[in-house]
Amino acid sequence: MDLKQYVSEVKDWPSAGVSFKDITTIMDNGEAYGYATDQIVEYAKEKNIDIVVGPEARGFIIGCPVAYSMGIGFAPVRKEGKLPREVIRYEYNLEYGTNVLTMHKDAIKPGQRVLITDDLLATGGTIEAAIKLVEQLGGIVVGIAFIIELKYLNGIDKIKDYDVMSLISYDE
């Protein structure tokens, strides 16, 4: 299935000059959403995954059905102040400022094999932060899966030491 046909491109959103890749048009088509989920599950099966991790919010949309299909758990990565129990945190730089992501301190057990999922790889900052959190807890990132990779933003450079799969890629 050509998933690219289900991606909506929204010009000049969220700011002028940006062509936003909207995956909600994959999600609202049961066949396309199911296909995307199944492709990631097939990728993950080879890796003996113990748990799926996804950053908010679209990482939840991708990771939860994958975890459910595999009969394993899902651990969220969230913005600071959104998780109720004791957390670990990772602060990283943005173009104009910083951002903080957190995970529950007990979300990953040392040695667990982890698949990280998200909707889109752009600059790689968010996924790099998720990797750092998983590894801080002793997890082993054995795969990273995206629906879309924006190759022209070179986010893959930040995660080049990991096994990464993307279902759709855009060169420009």
UniProtKB/Swiss-Prot annotation:
What EC designation does it have? 2.4.2.7
If you read the UniProt record, what top EC class would you report for this enzyme, in one word? transferase
* UniProt gene name: apt
Annotated organism of origin: Staphylococcus epidermidis (strain ATCC 35984 / DSM 28319 / BCRC 17069 / CCUG 31568 / BM 3577 / RP62A)
What is the stated purpose of this protein? Catalyzes a salvage reaction resulting in the formation of AMP, that is energically less costly than de novo synthesis.
List the Pfam families hit by this protein, alphabetically: Pribosyltran
Family annotation (InterPro entries): Ade_phspho_trans (IPR005764), PRibTrfase_dom (IPR000836), PRTase-like (IPR029057), UPRTase/APRTase (IPR050054)
Identify this protein by name.
Answer: Adenine phosphoribosyltransferase
Which PANTHER family does the record match to this protein?
ADENINE PHOSPHORIBOSYLTRANSFERASE (PTHR32315:SF3)
Q: Where is the protein situated, by its record's location annotation?
A: Cytoplasm
